[in-house]
């Protein structure tokens, strides 16, 4: 079972986002979809729901509401959490890295 989410370091994770996520995702309001969807407003939204992005059926049918904890569970191993997702990212195995990234995302995607 994945470790529980704990608030991390937003500064450390801005760099993690740039090196691990930015090539496929944007976070700013009105930002474009890239290979992956724009993540603005993701917390509180259900999986597969960003307007204008073409999700796999697996993402649409998962129906999970994104919270800090569900995002942590997903980012540990995306393909295990949502079998059939097209997200190619292998995941973040270290709970601290996930916590830092999610802390950054929670602020950057408001």
Swiss-Prot record:
One of its GO terms (molecular function) is metal ion binding. Binds 1 heme c group covalently per subunit. Keywords: Electron transport, Heme, Iron, Metal-binding, Methylation, Mitochondrion, Respiratory chain, Transport. Heme c binds at residues 21, 24-25, 87. It is found in: Mitochondrion intermembrane space. Its main location: mitochondrion. Gene3D superfamilies: Cytochrome c-like domain (1.10.760.10). InterPro entries: Cyt_c-like_dom, Cyt_c-like_dom_sf, Cyt_c_1A/1B. It comes from the Eukaryota. GO terms for cellular component: mitochondrial intermembrane space. The modification N6,N6,N6-trimethyllysine is found at residue 79. Pfam families: Cytochrom_C. Coiled coil: none annotated. Electron carrier protein. The oxidized form of the cytochrome c heme group can accept an electron from the heme group of the cytochrome c1 subunit of cytochrome reductase. Cytochrome c then transfers this electron to the cytochrome oxidase complex, the final protein carrier in the mitochondrial electron-transport chain. Belongs to the cytochrome c family. This is Cytochrome c. It comes from Schwanniomyces occidentalis.
